[in-house]
């Protein structure tokens, strides 16, 4: 790809390119070639307890007219749109060009090709496994502070010279607006890379009690084998966090990025290389999901899976792993964040203005393609007319179109498959419920679907139960006096339990919702939309059909990527096998 594809500071000499005919198995990394090849050589020569810089959430830039960040982003959008990125595999630090190419297109202008990515073959997956194994010999023995320094450096690069590049790639390749890209590709990913070292430090600080005769210690070892990271299209920050969180804890990773978010994923990989990530620690392997998963999930060195995607795919992977348990060296750690059917339930005391804004923002930002997006709402009869009218007025005011036009609130849905699926739900709504506003899909230029509000009298209606993953919100209106009854309906309607919110100005009603919906959402909001979790503030994840609830952006997630070893050293070992009770009286 051309040098203009990344900021000047982000360009480094390209490592040796490799074709599919070259075997990665026998090619040593630069660290394998270092003096003596001793596995302990990377332990830092440093005396002192080091502390990572205290993490602070990255401020969200406004991109207001006249601001320097707006000008820089506009310039990068223009230059990136004119480039045709050539996106290779990156295995053991080598760029692999397979020649089997797939186009990267703009969802909001699907005739515009941004570049092409090389599709991996089975032999490339084998090469990635070998590269991960080689890198683990060294990386697992780095002092944790040195590993943390790589990701702290990556955070600083993203906060400065790489910010416009990653935001532009997310906007053009995933059809996010400038604001949605900023809070995702910039701020949240920066936060992951700053907060995770802080959480790792806290974890490593946890040591057992000892007395004067012994020293008890916990050795927080990485897992034995490789971690398989499978990342989604809808959040660049998740694409960056899923491979790097296990890597921070000393693991090596094979990363399969989403085919519909390849441009931003590639730039993440190049940023990490500039930050000093050693070859083979993370291996970038785009390609057919089924082929890659079949290879990796059958390998004895599979140590973990870090996944974000559909519930059906995660269930299939879990089933495959369960059927292969006799294959593995250790029990694989399986961490997943999957589907959602996220709700807002309103009490009669709710503020209609705040509720309407929450429905519009929570349901239609990023075209409803957030895992946490509002998809179903329950509103009492007494306030529904005002809530409906306010929400429709907002919807009529929303602009939708090319995300490089900063006046637009919405872009396009991600691809033709999503466009078709959402269109089928719209048709179902027209035939079986009442479409209050929206409901139009236009796919000639981009995959555009209007923000849509559907009303139904049936609390078990299909659009209230199934994940749509688009800008479609379905409302059920209930009698005011049925408050506790509707809470039970909310809890039992969906198999998912990711996010949800209650709107009320009555504290008892809030207490009712918090209790009866305790297991209905892993992230629960009071008088706020159920989207926009911030690292360090609202650790994210849900249970039931929404995943393993291992809370990305917290210490809880990092615990899954270590295998502790308890070490006891005795200073005065016994010299007599007999115990005192054995003595004669």
Explain the meaning of each model-derived region.
Residues 98-99, 104-105, 110-204, 487, ...:
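Glycine-rich loop-to-alpha-helix module at the N-terminal edge of alpha/beta enzyme cores
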Residues 111, 132, 147, 250, ...:
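Residue-level signal for inorganic ion chemistry
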Residues 171, 190, 200-356, 545, ...:
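Rossmann-like NAD(P) dinucleotide-binding subdomain of oxidoreductase/dehydrogenase enzymes
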